[in-house]
Curated annotation (Swiss-Prot):
Organism this protein belongs to: Bacillus cereus (strain G9842)
Disulfide linkage: none
Family assignment from sequence similarity: Belongs to the UPF0354 family.
Protein's UniProt name: UPF0354 protein BCG9842_B0431
Coiled-coil zones: none
NCBIfam families: PRK13668.1
InterPro entries with a match to the protein in the record: DUF1444 (IPR010838)
């Protein structure tokens, strides 16, 4: 059987049929939206991507997507009822892993220097989610992660920019407590990548700033290093004094690149 986007839409609608959910199908964009009837919050599924996975994994691909959508929508509903938002926050890898003995925080690895934690934010109170709180929320770790990333993508952004020695620096500093969190917004990073002509360098020196730089020469690397160190020293919640080159969805710490460059130079001289 040849799988098409239309057939995949029908398969997913069968798997996800629930009285409290609605479906909307955009045949032009080949996107299926599944949303809650009451809140109108939902998930968009790009069908060609699921079809490509189906070509490899068959029924398992459909099961995985259906599970992801179901978990995310259930988490959204619980969050809606609790009156609080779950958002990811970036912290240093040296940040404590436990709220107290025997009660670890819910965490996800991010880069060699950073880790993702999850905050329950009700505007009045802000608390990092640990295992005990997770049980009270009646959520799974996966639901928390899906919900947090969904909410992170909804955070607005407006950059200020400055150009020094041909290098352009973009600063995000809304002071909403989640500026560094925007580093998790893949579509934001991709849109910046498209407008950048040189190396794309990203830094989160503390929780209230995100720096994205278009680096075209060695001076630019020196500037971003000094800038990141300065912000790191001044930050209320410091994260890392290192910046990262962003390429193909991966973050490479600058000091690793510098070491590699030195090794290459050494070989050439030898």
């Amino acid at each position: 059987m040849k799988m098409t986007s239309k057939k995949m839409k029908d398969e997913l609608m069968k798997k996800l049929s629930r009285p409290e959910w609605d479906f909307q199908y955009d045949s032009e964009k080949e996107v299926l939206r599944i949303e809650q009837k009451d809140s109108k919050k939902g998930i968009n599924v790009s069908l060609p991507g699921v079809v490509a996975k189906w070509e490899v994994n068959k029924e398992k691909a459909i099961e995985e997507v259906a599970y992801y959508v179901q978990e995310a929508l259930i988490a959204m509903h619980k969050e809606e009822n609790s009156g609080a938002k779950i958002l990811p926050v970036i912290r240093s890898t040296s940040f404590p892993k436990q709220a107290e003995e025997g009660n670890p925080f819910i965490m996800t690895d991010h880069t060699a220097e950073t880790r993702i934690y999850y905050a329950l934010d009700s505007n009045k109170t802000y608390r990092l989610i640990d295992e005990r709180l997770l049980q009270k929320l009646e959520l799974t770790e996966q639901q928390v992660r899906e919900m947090a990333l969904f909410n992170a993508r909804s955070l607005g952004y407006e950059f200020k920019q400055d150009t020094v020695a041909g290098n352009t620096f973009y600063f995000l500093n809304t002071n909403d407590g989640y500026d560094a969190t925007r580093i998790l917004n893949e579509s934001l990073l991709q849109s910046m990548r498209e407008k950048i002509s040189g190396d794309m360098v990203v830094a989160v020196p503390h929780q209230d700033v995100l720096i994205i730089a278009d680096i075209v020469n060695e001076i630019g690397y020196d500037i971003i290093a000094q800038m990141t160190m300065k912000f790191f020293a001044e930050g209320h919640v410091p994260i890392t004094s290192l910046s990262f080159v962003y390429e193909d969805g991966e973050f490479e710490p600058i000091f690793i690149l510098a070491k590699n460059r030195k090794k290459t130079d050494g070989k050439e001289k030898g």
